């Protein structure tokens, strides 16, 4: 199986003798502001609750999410991270085929494979990677399938308007459409793009979201889905009990009620993604894609350099980027970087400029820096 995540910092540092406290992790697209103070406070105040079993139905959190998304509690399922839900959906609904528009989040393919469902991959050959593209009509040839889409798409960052998603769902009534909106909270005008409020009203739409990326606590694992009541009931028959622990529920409830933090995050990311993108455009030999969210996909145009080699050289400067060569539809000429703090973003720009300005092939200069097999460890 492929790993669909970056951010394996501790594992890499433990195995190869690097200091995790000195690593700047651009491989995982987590909120640069970190975890909200209200979450830290709530967890500290309610820590003693771990002596009791958690609420297996996550009732308080489901109610809060239902209010936030203008639906009923019966339309919501809470998961131990969005990944639990990605694996649950095909296992419970058992489509005849899975369909993926590549490149996209690697866990989708693994989720289908885990349920022994054959996957049809449609490679997006448009250079700008639009989600709704000329290959979409090919879905008509696949009966009773399930389609996983990511909006904004990971790793390309492409954002698709709500009306285009709704049209796709209505045009494919016999195909379950699953939309991963893990990064939608970072979008300032998300009402133009999100279909989460439409999900309870449609028979073939499921929307999945993560709480850990936006609120900066991926170690806790917390996500949720919204769909119509009939679909939720089918999914719940296959969902394992007790998967969401007490601390995660406390953190999630505190987080989604912190509207000031959410507004500050969107403003901060908006400024910093522009700063990082503008800086990347000045570096020769690379082409950054216009960002919509808190990460940027970069195309390497210098044929002497590869993403694996650049990654290895940057690790010498304690900078970890996401090598995108293991995404279907991408190759060794792509990497992804998260938007972080101004100081960290500037350090990345300086280091990357130095790498790209070096007239020596990076493939040659990487020798004796980091063992070649390290690149495989950090491709998640």
Question: Each predicted region: which residue ranges?
Answer:
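N-terminal "arm"/small-domain region of PLP-dependent enzymes with the aminotransferase-like
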Residues: 1-52, 142-143
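Short loop-beta-helix segment that forms the pyridoxal 5′-phosphate
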Residues: 54, 66-88
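PLP-dependent aminotransferase-like
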Residues: 91-149
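Active-site phosphate-binding strand-loop segment of PLP-dependent enzymes
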Residues: 126-187
């Amino acid at each position: 199986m492929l790993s669909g995540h970056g951010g394996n910092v501790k594992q890499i540092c433990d195995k190869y003798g690097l200091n995790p406290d000195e690593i700047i992790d651009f491989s995982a697209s987590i909120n640069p502001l970190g975890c909200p103070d209200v979450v830290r406070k709530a967890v500290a105040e309610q820590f003693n609750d771990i002596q009791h079993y958690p609420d297996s139905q996550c009732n308080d959190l489901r109610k809060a999410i239902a209010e936030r998304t203008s639906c009923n509690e019966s339309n919501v399922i809470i998961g131990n991270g969005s990944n639990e839900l990605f694996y649950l959906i095909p296992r419970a609904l058992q489509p005849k085929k899975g369909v993926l528009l590549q490149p996209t989040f690697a866990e989708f393919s693994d989720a289908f494979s885990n349920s022994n469902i054959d996957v049809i991959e449609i490679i997006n050959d448009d250079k700008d990677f639009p989600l709704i593209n000329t290959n979409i009509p090919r879905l008509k040839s696949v009966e009773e399938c399930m389609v996983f889409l990511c909006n904004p798409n990971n790793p390309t960052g492409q954002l698709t308007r709500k009306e285009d998603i709704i049209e796709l769902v209505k045009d494919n009534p016999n195909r379950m459409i699953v939309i991963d909106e893990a990064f939608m909270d970072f979008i300032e005008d998300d009402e133009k793009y999100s279909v989460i409020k439409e999900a309870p009203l449609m028979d073939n739409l499921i929307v999945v979201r993560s709480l850990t990326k936006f609120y900066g606590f991926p170690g806790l694992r917390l996500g949720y889905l919204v769909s119509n009541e009939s679909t939720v009931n089918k999914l719940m028959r296959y969902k394992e009990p007790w998967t969401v622990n007490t601390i995660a529920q406390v953190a999630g409830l505190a987080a989604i009620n912190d509207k000031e933090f959410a507004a500050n995050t969107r403003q901060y990311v908006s400024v910093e993604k522009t700063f990082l993108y503008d800086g990347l455009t000045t570096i020769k030999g690379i082409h950054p894609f216009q960002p919509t969210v808190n990460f940027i996909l970069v195309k390497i145009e210098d044929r002497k350099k590869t993403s694996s080699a650049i990654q290895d050289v940057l690790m010498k400067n304690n900078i970890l980027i996401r090598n995108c060569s293991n995404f279907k539809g991408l190759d060794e000429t792509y990497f992804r970087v998260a938007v972080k703090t101004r100081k960290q973003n500037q350090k990345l720009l300086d280091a990357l400029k130095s790498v790209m300005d070096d007239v020596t092939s990076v493939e040659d200069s990487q020798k004796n820096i980091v063992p070649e097999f390290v690149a495989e460890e950090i491709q998640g």
